[in-house]
Amino acid sequence: SITDGQIFLDTDIFNSGIRPAVDVGISVSRVGGNAQIKAMKSIAGMLRLDLAQFRELEAFAKFGSDLDETTQKQLTRGRIMVEILKQNQYAPMPIEKQVVIIYAGLNGYLDATELDKVTIFETELLEYIAVNQSAIFDEIKNSGKLEEKNEGNLKGILDEFVKTFNA
């Protein structure tokens, strides 16, 4: 609908294995922010712009061979975020788990993770939190927010988990 926005799907994105194959650079939404819980809004506010910039940078990088370290890091983070956002058919993820995974990706906790291990990282991280700190999931789910105290706890958990995962 013209009043709510449009989602544009891209065959190149689809053919590269990314599902859903949404082109964030040209898709428009007026309701997206209103449909999100506060925790998601606070952590993913710049995600759409970051992904659009990543797509442009990735296209540019195909033509150049000498990329500086900052550009390489942006490309790596972008690829990780794309991997994080992939979704298997009939496999929805609860919002509290989405918040944790997107938070981890946007804040660099997966930067040292190889691209083919991102899914394993996600699975093991969510299991680790469910066993050791499930209260974070409950708080996000029940309040819809990622309070400062819980964000601090989440950072600590992520720091611990990354050390064991990358060991």
Regions found by a protein language model. Give the residues of each.
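Conserved catalytic/coupling modules of large nucleotide/cofactor-utilizing molecular machines
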Residues: S1-A167
